[in-house]
């Protein structure tokens, strides 16, 4: 069984990691905004340093070219990042290219 925690709360992530039952983390911009982080990239990198498993981070762009560019940047932040891409025609097109590049992608609505 895999257990993914849907949060951006660092303390919750630390506690879950300490218990050893969390497989990974899913985040989104609204969850991160609640945590009032000063720097989005640094904040995500901190989460990635706590959890060994996948950390899903959402790309906000809507057209394929912009999604690809944003996803490449996000994926460069840490080796355990999975980029969340919208399940739209543009997102699927971007996913095809990103997969060929070895970037881990999670399609979501």
Task: Outline where the language-model segments fall.
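Active-site beta->alpha loop and helix N-cap motifs at the rims of alpha/beta catalytic domains
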Residues: 3-5, 9-14, 19-22, 27-106
């Amino acid at each position: 069984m895999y257990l993914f925690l849907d949060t951006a709360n660092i303390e919750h992530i630390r506690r879950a990691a300490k218990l050893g039952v969390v497989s990974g983390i899913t985040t989104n911009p609204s969850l991160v905004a609640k945590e009032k982080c000063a720097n989005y990239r640094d904040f995500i990198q901190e989460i990635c340093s706590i959890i060994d498993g996948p950390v899903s981070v959402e790309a906000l762009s809507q057209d394929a070219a912009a999604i690809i560019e944003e996803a490449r940047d996000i994926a460069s932040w840490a080796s355990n990042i999975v980029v969340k891409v919208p399940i739209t025609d543009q997102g699927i097109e971007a996913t095809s290219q990103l997969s060929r590049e070895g970037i881990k992608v999670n399609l979501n609505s």
